[in-house]
């Protein structure tokens, strides 16, 4: 019997039976209930009935293919030769055989834990990059699994392609920075929450996975977790009448609170141990980003790369980066809004609860994160990855509805527009990625040439590398690669405890008084024309 005949008679094909079994395993109730729900949802939705059978034929193969394509793109387009820069050097040195670099108030411990299996064994940057790329693909796949259920698998995979196709996701996934992982944790957590709310019941495994996703996100970026899952808590309380779902809401809220307690609790404990308490740590975090000043446009200006600041004196682009790409970003935003309506129609159609609120949950959480990162004076493109990951779900919902709801020529036109949207993303975002990676490679070569110059000058452990108040941008990474300690703006030699001292200053600047008569060496030509003052007689 052909697939279409089985489909028309309501019988599940083997990939769908596997999907139904997986749903039943992660939620309460027998497998037959999951299969019946999948079948009834398909019959009830005319758009789903109209979907092409071959799109359903792959089943879980769609998310697997999307994650594999993302991982392959990382290996093809991200260079393994890019060295560790400032932030990466700090994270890589924490759980390793290396001298730990100074820990800042703005950082969280999740990322050093993630890469500990590599950093404990080797200092190879190539090994670290390969590990991060593979883990990034696995993380994207696991996050997509959380959204399987009433959405066809190809729609979930499409969301993964939309997010994974962004230049910032491809670049950051290969770097030792936390925002990509915060996006993965937030995406998985919101998906698990919505799936339980949509089904009206939870399971022990589902609650445990939700708590794990919240904990993971909070360990990566506590602020992201508080915003995303704080909003999810509010939605959990208001989306269903308490008289009908008290146990469900209690279980989900308990998982979220437990996850936040573990992840944010670690941050609070560390605040008391090393930073004088949470309030002082928050103040130090604000200072690290240049302060706080609300600006809702700055992040939009750098969606396609660059740096921007709300205050004079900090590096900032003029105007908008890559203005022609604004048309695609605008289409992305419009699709995300349409996706709220689409999800209400074919995912959250049950009138027993506030389907509009659940359909809008990804957009609400995305807007919350965007508002959070509209406050720092120095904004960075990478901070918004949780925003794009959540909006990708709504955009994929919109595309599904647009290509299945209409008939005849309208459907053909909708499919063509959807293909153009995805193709335009992959093409234009790759161009931005290539330009950004070229800049990082150039900076990386300059940094490593300067490190080699210092090595030839006899800089060896035990040593300390410091800078004047005008810090050279590669001071800390140089300390990492040379096996030295790093001290910001050392004021006297007693801080070195007898170790060799190297002072790096920008060209034309003067070092601290204790180093003014040391031999000055102009290092490899890089931004700022740095000069190194190396202590002799050691």
Model-derived regions, located:
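Hydrophobic, aromatic-rich transmembrane alpha-helices
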Residues: 312-356
């Amino acid at each position: 019997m052909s697939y279409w005949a089985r489909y028309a008679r309501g019988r599940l094909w083997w990939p769908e039976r596997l999907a139904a079994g997986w749903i039943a395993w992660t939620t309460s109730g027998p497998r037959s209930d999951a299969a019946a729900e999948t079948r009834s949802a398909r019959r009830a939705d005319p758009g789903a009935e109209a979907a092409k059978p071959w799109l359903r034929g792959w089943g879980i193969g769609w998310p697997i293919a999307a994650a594999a394509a993302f991982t392959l793109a990382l290996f093809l387009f991200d260079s393994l030769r890019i060295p560790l820069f400032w932030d990466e050097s700090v994270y890589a040195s924490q759980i390793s055989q290396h001298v730990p670099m100074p820990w800042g108030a703005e950082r969280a411990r999740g990322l050093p834990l993630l890469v500990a299996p590599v950093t404990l064994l080797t200092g190879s940057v190539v090994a670290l990059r390969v590990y991060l790329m593979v883990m990034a693909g696995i993380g994207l796949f696991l996050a997509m699994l959380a959204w399987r259920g009433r959405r066809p698998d190809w729609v979930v995979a499409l969301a993964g392609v939309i997010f994974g196709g962004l230049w910032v996701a491809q670049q950051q996934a290969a770097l030792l920075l936390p925002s990509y992982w915060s996006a993965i944790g937030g995406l998985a957590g919101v998906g698990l929450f919505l799936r339980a709310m949509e089904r009206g019941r939870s399971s022990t495994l589902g609650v445990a996975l939700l708590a794990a996703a919240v904990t993971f996100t909070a360990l990566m970026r506590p602020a992201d977790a508080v915003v995303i899952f704080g909003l999810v808590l509010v939605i959990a309380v208001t989306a269903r009448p308490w008289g009908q779902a008290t146990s469900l809401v209690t279980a989900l809220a308990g998982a979220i609170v437990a996850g936040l307690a573990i992840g944010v609790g670690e941050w609070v404990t560390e605040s008391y141990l090393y930073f004088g308490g949470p309030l002082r740590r928050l103040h130090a975090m604000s200072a690290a980003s240049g302060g706080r000043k609300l600006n809702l446009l700055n992040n939009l200006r750098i969606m396609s790369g660059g740096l921007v600041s709300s205050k004079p004196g900090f590096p900032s682009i003029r105007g908008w980066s890559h203005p022609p790409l604004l048309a695609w970003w605008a289409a992305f935003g419009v699709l995300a809004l349409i996706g709220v309506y689409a999800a209400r129609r074919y995912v959250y159609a049950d009138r027993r609860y506030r389907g509009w609120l659940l359909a809008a949950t990804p957009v609400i959480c995305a807007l919350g994160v965007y508002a959070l990162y509209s406050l720092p004076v120095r904004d960075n493109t990478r901070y918004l990855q949780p925003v794009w990951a959540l909006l990708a779900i709504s955009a994929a919902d919109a595309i599904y509805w647009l290509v299945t709801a209409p008939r005849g020529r309208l459907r053909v036109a909708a499919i063509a527009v959807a293909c153009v949207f995805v193709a335009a993303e992959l093409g234009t975002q790759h161009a931005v990625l290539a330009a950004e990676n070229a800049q990082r490679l150039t900076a990386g070569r300059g940094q490593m040439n300067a490190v080699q110059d210092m090595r030839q000058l006899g800089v060896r452990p035990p040593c300390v590398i410091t800078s004047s108040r005008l810090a050279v941008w590669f001071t800390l990474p140089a300390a990492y690669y040379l096996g030295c300690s790093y001290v910001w703006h050392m004021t006297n030699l007693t801080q070195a405890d007898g170790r060799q001292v190297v002072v790096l200053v920008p060209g034309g600047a003067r070092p601290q008084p204790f180093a003014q008569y040391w031999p000055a060496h102009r290092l490899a030509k890089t931004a700022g024309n740095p000069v190194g003052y190396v202590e002799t007689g050691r």
